[in-house]
A protein has these predicted regions:
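N-terminal small/glycine-rich loop or linker at the start of catalytic domains
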Residues: 1-19, 76, 99, 129-133
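Short, acidic/polar
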Residues: 23-33, 86-96, 142-151
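N-terminal glycine-rich anion-binding loops that anchor highly charged ligand groups
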Residues: 2-9, 31-48
């Protein structure tokens, strides 16, 4: 049986409550607390190329910026960001080097499934772990979910 992993999205989803304004020092404290709490996957915020970066907010336009809140001792945890399909160009991502995030959660709506999955493939080719986030899941029929699962399993 596979092991269940716990993902914490405080620094991203919690940003809907405070406009992602956590403060740089608090971002680092939260991440360290999550590592110490033995959370498996820590989502550090939003990745979106078009935003203006401010270190007090968990919205990033480069993966290097995300690396500033990731502790040197990662404690075996995975660090990720969420990126909406169409708001970043996976071709522009640096190749994975272990200095920043380990993976990217690619979010897309049903109408963007093909493009979203192509983006997932490109992210994976850069060496990152890929997490597929189908948005508004209630809009999918059972058959469409099965199609999505099948197509995700084809990503190499």
């Amino acid at each position: 049986m596979r092991r269940v992993q716990l993902l914490d999205c405080t620094l991203r989803d919690g940003g809907y409550c405070n406009d992602c304004h956590f403060g740089f020092e608090n971002e680092k404290k939260i991440v360290n607390g999550l590592v110490e709490s033995n959370i498996d996957v820590i989502e550090c915020g939003f990745f979106k190329e078009s935003i203006e970066y401010d270190s007090d907010y968990t919205r990033f336009n480069s993966l290097e910026q995300v690396g500033r809140i990731i502790p040197q001792n990662r404690g075996g945890k995975l660090f990720v960001v969420l990126a909406d399909y169409g708001k970043f160009d996976p071709k522009k991502l640096p190749d994975y080097n272990g200095a920043s995030v380990d993976g990217i959660r690619v979010a897309f709506h049903k109408k963007d499934m093909s493009g979203g999955l192509e983006a997932c493939q490109k992210v994976k080719e850069k060496g990152y772990k890929v997490f597929v986030q189908a948005m508004v899941s209630v809009a999918y029929t059972d058959e469409e979910f099965l199609e999505l699962i099948s197509r995700v399993n084809e990503i190499e």
